[in-house]
Curated annotation (Swiss-Prot):
PANTHER family reported for this sequence: ABC TRANSPORTER I FAMILY MEMBER 1
Name of the encoding gene: ccmA1
Record-listed E.C. numbers: 7.6.2.5
Gene Ontology biological-process annotations: cytochrome complex assembly
Catalytic activity field: heme b(in) + ATP + H2O = heme b(out) + ADP + phosphate + H(+)
Species whose genome carries this gene: Salmonella typhimurium (strain LT2 / SGSC1412 / ATCC 700720)
Protein name: Cytochrome c biogenesis ATP-binding export protein CcmA 1
Keyword flag ATP-binding: yes
Subunit structure: The complex is composed of two ATP-binding proteins (CcmA) and two transmembrane proteins (CcmB).
Taxonomic lineage: Bacteria, Pseudomonadati, Pseudomonadota, Gammaproteobacteria, Enterobacterales
InterPro entries, alphabetized: AAA+_ATPase, ABC_transporter-like_ATP-bd, ABC_transporter-like_CS, ABC_transptr_haem_export_CcmA, P-loop_NTPase
Amino acid sequence: MLEARDLYCERDERTLFRGLSFTVDAGEWVQVTGGNGAGKTTLLRLLTGLARPDGGEVYWQGEPLRRVRDSFHRSLLWIGHQPGIKTRLTARENLHFFHPGDGARLPEALAQAGLAGFEDVPVAQLSAGQQRRVALARLWLTRAALWVLDEPFTAIDVNGVARLTRRMAAHTAQGGMVILTTHQPLPGAADTVRRLALTGGGAGL
């Protein structure tokens, strides 16, 4: 279980949220919503331990995140707004960097992400959407329980969004957890996703 307890965050003398508390249990996924500048990416960075809140605490499996950082990161898949891939490497080589023991599974993961036939193309030669798919192919490889995804559908077409949404649904059905930001609808998942709305100083589930 991931828990945010009484989080407070201020940026540039402006309160993004205060008193923000919620939990994400096994089998749940949460969509963080809010306007530009509401603090969606900031919240995800707090939840992954990439930044510290100005007040409050994040807990993983009942322990403060700062005390269990190593075990938490072994349970985490974080894909930020920037795909975090190496443009000089091929799609296959990028996945091998993150999943060196899964060589036989890499082509299938890339195919699931819509990159069949692009496995050995340097990422620098791929479109923005294809580069995003290289990062998202990790969803078919990772063994992490918690997925935190910042705008995963950017530059992804409708069919790709549907395929990724099905993968997230399968992950939560198996007891995984997903937290994501997106402005796009989640096809077939509207009734199962909890929405956390950041409203400028507060939030509501």
